């Protein structure tokens, strides 16, 4: 039996995850000791790994790529956010032995933009680049903030149109995107290999915030491009990472961490 409350992040790979450091900072704020580990589940072995974790005393888990859709199907019940996103990044062990799935990615993004970067989403025009799981996961919460308009652009138009129909937003081909957006969010994974979304530099001429959902070096190509093209402010996804983790922590423990000092702590590492 484990003496400390036990949590973990599941992914493949998982060794790079910053979640253990982030959650230990939250535990310091709460004044408690927790155990938080990384679990690299085999492809095809995720459900068994999660089952074993909870059966041996696990209290809650984060889920990262490539298991967010599988986590959705594994959960016994879902939050409205998870249902809308069709993906789960947080698993909560309930007292009756069932597992509840939630998605805190959108909360992390929206809180970083509105509370840390101090830019309101309400009434603004938003451009989302990419149409994968990362983008789908944040649209429901962005819509809750009542922007004037959300447009999604993707390399393959069909995927963008599918999300546009699902969420009642607009879709355009990347090559056809022009300016007129207050907030531009990059949800493509191109930065991981140094690639930029195939968009014109003109899209940044009215941009108040260019945001990349990945962080550190992976965000650099897009943010440099945005800055050089006229974006007034740029930000990587570290605040989103800390914010979604804080929302997960609150679901597990009923304690709401202050994300600002943790963002600064993670920047210094």
Curated annotation (Swiss-Prot):
Q: Which reaction does it catalyse?
A: shikimate + NADP(+) = 3-dehydroshikimate + NADPH + H(+)
Give the annotated active site: 68 (proton acceptor)
Molecular function (Gene Ontology), one example: NADP binding
GO biological process terms, semicolon-separated: amino acid biosynthetic process; aromatic amino acid family biosynthetic process; chorismate biosynthetic process; shikimate metabolic process
UniProt pathway annotation: Metabolic intermediate biosynthesis; chorismate biosynthesis; chorismate from D-erythrose 4-phosphate and phosphoenolpyruvate: step 4/7
Q: Name one Pfam family in it.
A: Shikimate_dh_N
Respond yes or no to whether keyword Magnesium is given for this record: no
Listed under subunit, the entry gives: Homodimer.
Q: What does this protein do?
A: Involved in the biosynthesis of the chorismate, which leads to the biosynthesis of aromatic amino acids. Catalyzes the reversible NADPH linked reduction of 3-dehydroshikimate (DHSA) to yield shikimate (SA).
| Protein name, entry field | Shikimate dehydrogenase (NADP(+))
The organism of origin for this protein: Neisseria gonorrhoeae
Task: From the UniProt record, report the name of the gene that encodes this protein.
Answer: aroE
